[in-house]
Amino acid sequence: PPLLAVTSGCAKFSFVAKEELFRNPFFCWLIRRLGAFPVARGKGDLKVIDESTDKIKQGRNLVIFPEGTRSKDGKVGRGKTGVALIAAKSGVPVVPAGIVFEGKLHFRSRITIKYGKPVMPEEIHVGDEPSPHELKEIKSRIMGEIKELVEGEDGRN
C-alpha cells in the first residue's frame, strides 16, 4: 500500500507501520522515505496518536490499518480504538478503504482497493476528550464501512 500511494504522485502520505519493520536499517530507511512512522502495537502507544494528528495538521494524508494486522482469511477483524481517537482529535474526514485480494496467496493475487464515502467530522465530533463509549462508537462506524467494502453486503468478497 505505501508503494501505491507513492507511485500515484497525487498527495503526500504518511503511514503508521508496526515498529518491527523499522529494525532492519535499509528497510527502515526505505519506509521512512515513503512516509512511514512506527507504532508499538498492543502497548497503547499514545505518542502515535499525537504524531498522527501532527502529520494531518501538516497537510499529509494519514494511512492507517485500524486492525493492526492483516487478515489471514479475508474477513475484516476488530479495529483498534486508536483509529477512533485519531479521527476524533484530527477533525478531518475519514475515507474508509478496503483491500481485497482475489487469491489465497496475497503476494500472488490481484489486489483491488475499494474506497467508501468519507465519514465527515461532524458525524463523529465528540469534543476534546472522547469517552471510551464514544471511541467505540466511532471505531464501529469506521470498521463497519470497511467491512462493507471488503466483504460486501452478503459478508463475502
List PLM regions with ranges.
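Non-catalytic C-terminal accessory region of glycerolipid acyltransferases
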Residues: K47-N157
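Catalytic core of membrane glycerolipid acyltransferases/transacylases, capturing the structured
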Residues: P1-K43, E51
